[in-house]
């Protein structure tokens, strides 16, 4: 089991394949994805890696977190996520993960916070069919109808599909295909839609319900020191 990655959702576009087919894809950006800390069995009781992504202003980071980043010799990050890994899957603190962590054609699971829709009725929230347009139905055309039984049990069961707050929830979309990766620009192109709005953070992991392809970099695809040094002047020039 490998570590996942943290990525920022850039938006959607389309890619043209060699046979002329066009595929809708979501573009995910790896923004300074680094290992911030390790969790070990001896010290923490489990093994995991803590990854950080995005750049945070120092004045917006708490004193405790500034010390945490300083101990790892890593710049303050906007987003931190832990990924459980086996002992041999631990990654060195400070290492930067590349977009080549995934292979083209590989299946992945993407987790994010869905776009909030506010209060929604049963037809929009749960795809209910609603009541009849006529034949005695007045006012209640879009209502959900009956919600339970009679005197026994005399209540509405928890989890009953009714009107309520829609979206803004943690959602995982499984078995999405990696169409293309661009290590130079730190981009991963995922077939179809992924949860969340533009500029939202998502996590991407190897699909749990599909067999991993051969040749996956283990424990991760890391950027070399030369690649990191080559990117630094370019980033400074853009700023």
UniProtKB/Swiss-Prot annotation:
Methylated by PrmB. InterPro entries: Ribosomal_uL3, Ribosomal_uL3_bac/org-type, Ribosomal_uL3_CS, Transl_B-barrel_sf. GO terms for molecular function: rRNA binding; structural constituent of ribosome. The modification N5-methylglutamine is found at residue 151. GO terms for biological process: translation. Pfam families: Ribosomal_L3 (PF00297). It comes from the Bacteria. Keywords: Methylation, Ribonucleoprotein, Ribosomal protein, RNA-binding, rRNA-binding. SUPFAM superfamilies: Translation proteins (SSF50447). GO terms for cellular component: cytosolic large ribosomal subunit. The keyword Transcription regulation does not apply. Part of the 50S ribosomal subunit. Forms a cluster with proteins L14 and L19. Belongs to the universal ribosomal protein uL3 family. One of the primary rRNA binding proteins, it binds directly near the 3'-end of the 23S rRNA, where it nucleates assembly of the 50S subunit. NCBIfam families: L3_bact (TIGR03625). This is Large ribosomal subunit protein uL3. It comes from Ruegeria sp. (strain TM1040). The gene is rplC.
